[in-house]
Structures are given as C-alpha cells and as structure tokens.
Amino acid sequence: MTLKTALTREDILDLAAYEKIREQRRGEIVAAKKLRRVAVGPYATFYFESFDTMWYQVQEMLRIEKGGEAQLTDELEAYNPLIPKGKELVATVMFEIDNPDIRTAFLAGLGGVEDRMMIKINGEQVIAKSEQDVDRTNAAGKASSVQFVHFNFSTD
C-alpha cells in the first residue's frame, strides 16, 4: 500500500455522495482521532493528523460552506501541508481553556510556543517546526490557541 501524502480533487466526494456515507465516516474518524490525541498538561492537546483526518476536514468544510470548486482549491491548499509526508508527524496543537479571561492571560504569556515544542521517541529528540502559513504569535506576543507543527524524524 502506498502512503498517501496529499489530497487531490479525485479523492473528494461530491456533496451528495458524501452525505450518504457521512455518518459512518464520522464515526470512524472520531474513533481514530481518539487514538491520535495526546493531552500535555492541563490545557494543551496534540491531535496527530493523517490523510484520513484531513480528508474528513476538507469534506466537512465543503459540506458546511458549499463553496464548490473554488473552495475546494483553497481547502486542498490549506490542508495538504498538514498530511504527514513520510518520516514526520504533524500535529494540530490546541490550547483549550473555557474561561475567556484565563485563556487570554494564558495565551498572552505563551508567545513563541510554536518554536519551543519537541517530542522525544526512543531517545531521539525532535524539535517541532511550525506551519509557516501565518504567524501564530502576534506582535504583542500573544500565541494563537491553535498551532500546527511538524516533527521531522531522521532517516536513521
């Protein structure tokens, strides 16, 4: 089996076909995401992405927004970078704090966090590289509550 590292137009179902399988696929994706979720501390959760999780995200965005082919191009451009390419893990990192005052204060002190994440597996320490689509820390030093990071492992 070949590892799929990018979504194409051919992978995406039209809205009518997607509606027929949506509930089944949703259940499968929810179950898979539970196994790909790692809580780190009281507020941070890493959601490790895959071809399937990004396929589902694109399908759901198209379903909700109904933007047609123009939207599909944008969604593929936005989500393809989050599909792992070989020897890497890609994570969506979410800082989840219900209280807006605590969340604002917490994120204000977290600027640059996207450059300080790492993962250690079998003694190998891999520093995260943030997705470069937009700055995830603003000029005032406040971090975004959602970060996208890549962990690129060596070929050894």
Predicted regions and their residues:
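Long, hydrophobic N-terminal alpha-helical segment
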Residues: R22-F48, W55, M61-R63
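Short, extreme N-terminal leader segments that mark the start of a protein/domain
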Residues: M1-A31, L35-R37
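A glycine-rich, hydrophobic loop/mini-helix early in the fold
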Residues: F48-V90
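Residue-level signal for secondary-structure boundary elements
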Residues: K34-R37, K66, A70, M118
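A broad, low-specificity signal for short, low-complexity segments enriched in glycine/proline
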Residues: L3-R9, A16-A17, S50-V58, A78-P81, ...
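Long, charge-patterned amphipathic alpha-helical coiled-coil/hairpin "stalk" segments used as oligomerization
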Residues: Y79-D156
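Short, flexible active-site loop motifs that bind/organize anionic cofactors or intermediates
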Residues: T8, A44, F148
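N-terminal start-of-chain detector that recognizes signal peptides
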Residues: A16-K20, R26-G27, R63-G68, V90, ...
